[in-house]
Amino acid sequence: MSDFNTLRWLHGQPQGQGRLKVSPTDFQVVEDLGFAPDGDGEHLLVRIRKTGCNTRAVADALAKFLGIAAREVSFAGQKDKYAVTEQWLCARLPGKEMPAMRAFTLEGCEVLEFARHRRKLRLGALKGNRFSLVLRDITHRDEIEQRLSLISEKGVPNYFGPQRFGRGGSNIYQAKRWAQTGQPPRERNKRGFALSAARSLMFNTLVSERLQRFGVNQVMDGDALQLAGRGSWFVTTPEELTDLQARVDSGELLITAALPGSGDWGTQRAALAFEQATLADETELLTLLTREKVEAARRAMLLFPRELRWQWQDDATLEVSFWLPAGSFATSVIRELFNTADDVSDISE
């Protein structure tokens, strides 16, 4: 099964080199929930800017400040520690007065705003993230300029980034050990990380193999197609292939790949046969996902960064910004620009 660094590129392997995070200010992320606080309710939403802090540590510090259990503070997603990030935390405070949030202090953190809300903020309940990056020590400027234009027009493979798999692939190691021995990781969150990593790696393998053999825009009989920007999908039939191919070429529809698990994968006929053959050697992980009742799903094979903008500070330093939907990875965009020796396994999605 493919390592992230050996997955196929949509625009060919880059020739250039570059560095992704020389300092925290080079990697800035602003969370986009997609909704505003209600203004009333038993929950408190707090928007925080943090540098050099991981999300869980900030949540625990907020719980301590508010005098509540750590489990009463939630967030929509983990954000990178070695970066400047803005995100919302949610604290359940039924029947309590509005706390003096400006008095909350934690090194590297700043409270930006806060308001009451009616519902708990759950993991994954965000629209997306806006990234502002400074890329340094870049070579092959002309090639990277061309690649930025290609990415803007044609997107990138929607790979799960290496951070999904843990440092040194630790989450995948846990999943394979679990599959082989039947012994799950002791901690609940590590079990979740292992299962997520297993099917994410298989998704990456499907996309890379499809890209190599057919291209990610070639519609097959039985493909599961998704309306761009939507989560629902439908299955192609032989009679519709010509019309659906035109809609894929125009960007109206996206071809999906399986997030394997229990139940129907969604594809049929030729597309299903391709997915099954590609993952034929992964019976242990597939059995694990089925046994643990991880429901199969679909994910678009292509990712289109929105509002992609860039500006050169000098010939070797590039500022680039873009918006990605929840669950997408900035590292999967950057890998289409240049090669990097930086360890990006700790960059949160």
From Swiss-Prot:
List the Pfam families: TruD (PF01142)
Q: What is its EC number?
A: 5.4.99.27
Q: Which organism is it from?
A: Cronobacter sakazakii (strain ATCC BAA-894) (Enterobacter sakazakii)
Q: Its GO biological process terms?
A: tRNA pseudouridine synthesis
One MF term in GO for this entry?
tRNA pseudouridine(13) synthase activity
Q: Which UniProt keywords apply?
A: Isomerase, tRNA processing
Function (record text): Responsible for synthesis of pseudouridine from uracil-13 in transfer RNAs.
Which residues participate in substrate binding? 27, 129, 329
Cross-referenced InterPro entries, in alphabetical order? PsdUridine_synth_cat_dom_sf, PsdUridine_synth_TruD, PsdUridine_synth_TruD_CS, PsdUridine_synth_TruD_insert, TruD_catalytic, TruD_insert_sf, TruD_pseudoU_synthase
What PROSITE patterns does this protein's entry cite? Answer: TRUD (PS50984), UPF0024 (PS01268)
Name of the protein in its database record = tRNA pseudouridine synthase D
What is the annotated signal peptide range for this record? Answer: none
One Gene Ontology cellular component annotation held by this UniProt entry: cytosol
Catalytic residues, chain numbering: 80 (nucleophile)
Superkingdom of the source species: Bacteria
Q: Report the catalytic activity.
A: uridine(13) in tRNA = pseudouridine(13) in tRNA
Q: Which residues form the TRUD domain?
A: 155-303
Q: Which family does the similarity line name? A: Belongs to the pseudouridine synthase TruD family.
